[in-house]
Every structure is written in structure tokens, then in C-alpha cells.
UniProtKB/Swiss-Prot annotation:
It is a multi-pass membrane protein. This is UPF0391 membrane protein RPC_2356. The keyword Isomerase does not apply. One of its GO terms (cellular component) is plasma membrane. The lineage of its organism: Bacteria, Pseudomonadati, Pseudomonadota, Alphaproteobacteria, Hyphomicrobiales. The chain crosses the membrane at residues 6-26, 35-55. Belongs to the UPF0391 family. The keyword Transmembrane applies. It comes from Rhodopseudomonas palustris (strain BisB18).
Length: 57
């Protein structure tokens, strides 16, 4: 019974993702993810440089 339950859960998830993937929602979320990636990359690089220079113990 649990295998059938998991198969049904994955079917529902795949249908939802398929519906969202064939609309404009995926493109919008990809743009948001790209912007967040670059923001966190800049924050990481700033903290890395500060950690190697100013905040060295």
C-alpha cells in the first residue's frame, strides 16, 4: 500500500510541476532565482575578502 501511496504522491507532484512548467511561472521563478544567485554571490565574495583581510584574528 505504501508504494501505491508514493506513486500517487509523485504523480500529483509531477502534474503540478508540469502545469507550472508549461506556463510563464517557471520563467519568472528562474529570473528570481538568477537574481538571488548573483546577490548571494556578491555577499559571499565581500565576506570572503573581509574574512581574509580585515577580520583576520
Amino acid at each position: 500500500m505504501t508504494i501505491l501511496k508514493w506513486a500517487l504522491i509523485f504523480f500529483v507532484v509531477s502534474v503540478i510541476v508540469g502545469v507550472l512548467g508549461f506556463t510563464g511561472i517557471s520563467a519568472a521563478s528562474a529570473d528570481v532565482a538568477r537574481i538571488l544567485f548573483y546577490i548571494f554571490l556578491v555577499i559571499f565574495l565581500v565576506l570572503l575578502i573581509l574574512g581574509l583581510t580585515i577580520f583576520r584574528a
